[in-house]
Amino acid sequence: DQSCPWCGFTCCLPNYCQGLTCTVI
């Protein structure tokens, strides 16, 4: 999801990746 902040190849904390998608907390 482009609305989720990405840091390199991982989601920026405290968000987390679930497969190829990123979940925003």
UniProtKB/Swiss-Prot annotation:
Residues bearing PTM 4-hydroxyproline: 5
Location, primary (coarse class): secreted
Keywords recorded for this protein, A-Z: Disulfide bond, Hydroxylation, Knottin, Neurotoxin, Secreted, Toxin
GO molecular function: toxin activity
Tissue: Expressed by the venom duct.
Key word Secreted present: yes
Cellular compartments annotated: Secreted
Superkingdom of origin organism: Eukaryota
Disulfide bonds: 4-12, 7-17, 11-22
GO CC annotation: extracellular region
Entry text on domains: The cysteine framework is VI/VII (C-C-CC-C-C).
Function recorded in the entry: Causes scratching and restlessness in mice.
Other remarks in the entry: The order of the last three amino acids has not yet been definitively established.
Name of the protein this chain belongs to: Conotoxin QcVIA
Species, as recorded: Conus quercinus (Oak cone)
Lineage: Eukaryota, Metazoa, Spiralia, Lophotrochozoa, Mollusca
